[in-house]
Amino acid sequence: MKLLGWMHRKLRSNNDVFKEFNTGGGGACNCITGLASPDHDNDYFSGDDAAHASPPVTAGDLFTFGGSGLLTIGTLGIAAVAIPSGGDDDDYDIDFEVDATSDDDGGFTVEDDDADVGGAVTPTFTFPAATAAEAVVATVEKAVAAVEAIAEKDDDTTTEDDLMVVSAELEKVLGGVDVASARVSFAMGGGVDCPLQGFLFGSPVSDVESRPEYLQAPRDSSGSCGGGGRRTSLGELFMRTRFADEKVALVAVAEGEDGVAGDDGAAAAGVGGDRAGKGGGYKTMKKRKVKDEKGGGGAAGGGMPATVTKSKFQKILQIFHRKVYPENTLLTRNLTKKSRNRGATDNGGGAVATGDPDGPLASPVLRCRKDHPMRGFGCCTNGAFGASSPGGNAEMNGNKSGHWIKTDADYLVLEL
C-alpha cells in the first residue's frame, strides 16, 4: 500500500492532466493543453522538495481524485470507491502480535491477541507425549539385559528357554519378525545343521546329532565338546559341516583318480618297463593310503599326519575351484584327455616307446627335438617342414603346433 501511494503521488505531481481535473477548470477538453508545471510541483527538478519529506498521503488521494469518480488504476469508473471515515484512514497496515508459549506438558501452542475477531477459533497445536517411543526403548533395554544375562552363564547352565530367547532376538535383528512362526528353532528340532548357531550359543546342543559320529569330538566329564572344555571355533564348525556335505564328492574324486592312475600304471608297466610301473603303483598306493587314513583317523579320534591334512586341503581347494569356475575345470579335463590320447597314439609303436630296434623310428618331431637341444631353433621352426613331413604328423605340424614368422606374407596370413 505504501508503494502504491508513492506511485500515485508521483503520477499526480508530474502529470498536468490530473492537475486540470483536480482544479476543475478545463474538464475533459483541457487534456490536450500542455501547461508547464511549476517548479515546486515537480519532484524531480525541485531542490526544496527533494530535501524535505513528502506530505502524508490520505485514503482519499489513493482512491479518488477530488470526487470526480476516477479510479486510481487509470480507467474511467462509473461510481467512486467508498472510503471509510474515521481514525482508521491514516493507516492500513495490520500487525498481529503472536505469542508463542510452551506448555508444561511438552506441547507447543500458538496464540494471538485478537482471538475473537470474526468468531474464528485460534488454532492450537499440541504434540502428543512420546509414550510409544519410551515403551519401545524400555522393551529393547529389557531384551538386551536378558541376552547379556544369558551370555554370562556357563555352557552347562544354559537351558532351552535361554536358547529360545536368544533365537527370538536374533530373528528380530535379522528381520525375521515378518516370517511366519513355522520356522522351528534348532533347540526344538535338534536336527538343523547350521554351524553359526553353535558358534553363537556355544553350548553342547549345537553338536548333538548335527554331524556324523566320526566327525564328533570326544566329550569330557563336564559335557562340553572339543575336549577340555574348549569352545569350538567358527572355522572348525564350518569345516566339519563342509566335510559332512561333500563326503560323497571327495570319495568320488578319490576313486576316479585311483582308477585312472591304476589304468595308466598298468599300461605303462606292460609297454615301457619297470620305471613306469613303479610310478603308477606308487601313485595308487599313496592315494589308497591317504584314503584309508582319512577313513580310520576320524573314527579313532587320533591326530592325522601332515601329509593327509595337506591332501585333504588340496582336494577341498579343487572342489571349491570346480564350483566357482566350472568352465575352466571342464576345459582342463578335456585338454588332459586329449594329451593322454595323443601320447598313447604317438608312443604306441617305435624304438623310443618299445625299445625294439627293428620297429619303425619315432616321429620326426621327437628326433628333431632330440638332435637339437635348444627348442625352437631347429628343423621344427622351418615353415616348409609340414609339407615334407609324413601324413601322420601333418595335423600336429599344421594346426596344433605353430611355426616362426619369417616373412611379411606369413604375418599377413595370420592377420587375415
Swiss-Prot record:
InterPro entries: LAZY1 (IPR038928). Residues 270-282 have a biased composition (Gly residues). Expressed specifically in the cells at the inner side of the vascular bundles of young leaf sheaths and peripheral cylinders of vascular bundles in the unelongated stems. Expressed in the leaf sheath pulvinus and the lamina joint. Residues 266-306, 337-361 are annotated as: Disordered. Disruption phenotype: Tiller-spreading phenotype due to defective shoot and tiller gravitropism. Extremely larger leaf angle at reproductive stage. Altered endogenous auxin distribution in shoots. Belongs to the LAZY family. This is Protein LAZY 1. It comes from Oryza sativa subsp. japonica (Rice).
